[in-house]
Amino acid sequence: MNFRRTKIDWCTHTWNPVAGCLHGCDYCYARRIAQRFGPHATERFMADKDSGAVGILTEPEAPGCYTISHAVKLADNTGKYTRSTPYPMGFAPTLSAHLMSNPEKNITPARVFVCNMGDLFGEWVPDKWIETVFDACSRAPQHVYMFLTKNPARYLKLAQAGKLPRGDNFWYGTTITAPDQEYFYAEGYKTYLSIEPLLSAFSENDTGGALEMVDWVIV
């Protein structure tokens, strides 16, 4: 969940201030990871000794979404600490407030895949979460931020509201698997496509010329 180096060949680091997703894709690798490292059936949440709190807050304006202030501690049936998890609610959308300072703490410029463990621009994500992530990115302009979504309409809504940052270090990607799917492109923004998994054949003229309109294509 932290600012981590990655083997993904088109970025150097991943950063997950928001994780979890409700798209329900059958081929989702992130959901499998969250289920693996989230709480197991034999574990339960462990409260902080000083505050008595677990550290999980619900979002009144976004049912099914959560905020955590730190990696949540887990205990076994005897109450003994076993480990901490960044996925206390499994793959439910979760904002990790304690990770917002990570870009600033990492001085060396990096190409950062933001929220590879979820979809920051899913319709269920509160606007304030997105704004908080953008603010954290803006405070550390030495990095290039790679955003990726299956819901490009959210990009458009934010752009029309003047809330989608412009700049050479803000890249907005759309995941598509077939040539008839929607994507985001707008003048003045760095945009790209991630065609993964590739489920249908593409040509230069597919999706209204998407392969030529965007700045970059990942296959």
What do these predicted ranges mean?
Residues 92-219:
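Conserved AdoMet/S-adenosylmethionine-binding subsite of the radical SAM
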Residues 1-111:
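N-terminal [4Fe-4S]-dependent radical SAM core
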